[in-house]
Amino acid sequence: MNRPLIVASLPVTSPGDISRVKDIDADLVELRLDYSREFPRPQDLLPYRDRILVTLRDREEGGQGNFTDNFKETFLNELMKLGILYDVEASFLSRRRVQFREKVVSAHYFHRLPSREEVDCLFSTYREAFTVKIAVSNLPGYREILSYISTKPGSTFMPMSPDPLERLAISLLGSRLLYTYVDSPTATGQLHYLEAKRILNCLF
């Protein structure tokens, strides 16, 4: 059983929020820039490059963002040039050219579960990613498909379940990342990062 990396999700509403990264004791801090009212410049993130995961989550994927494809493609490509880790949706990659090697490629299933064939295709297409992250709603059969995803090397997987302990327990099947929150949950069922860290410290 491998310990997942703790990702502490931090909504960034203004560039000043970014300085909080240095005080958050997690493996990675996810900067949720889709909450931003005043967008930071990519260069502003450089001092925290080794500690952050940048996410611009579109509304259709469960986020707060309303970005044009051109803006998002340009911003992510700037992050790539600076060597900053980011999350990019598989749905976005299907229509735009963005580097995904050693990045997080994500897919979210709100109203249905993916088939095994879809899962296989995601991991084959994005095999060079740092991790392929799949989140599924707790529909009938969700535990079975999460168990299948857990067999994929380097995968990240989670249920959109209101039960934080189930989310944590499922991550112990071998998920590379465990998403948590800093101030308030950015997704259903997240634990506070310090609570997740306390539990994992007892187990590992």
Swiss-Prot record:
One of its GO terms (biological process) is amino acid biosynthetic process. Its EC number is 4.2.1.10. SUPFAM superfamilies: Aldolase. It is an enzyme of class 4 (lyase). The active site is at H108 (proton donor/acceptor), K133 (schiff-base intermediate with substrate). Involved in the third step of the chorismate pathway, which leads to the biosynthesis of aromatic amino acids. Catalyzes the cis-dehydration of 3-dehydroquinate (DHQ) and introduces the first double bond of the aromatic ring to yield 3-dehydroshikimate. Belongs to the type-I 3-dehydroquinase family. NCBIfam families: PRK13576.1. This is 3-dehydroquinate dehydratase. The gene is aroD.
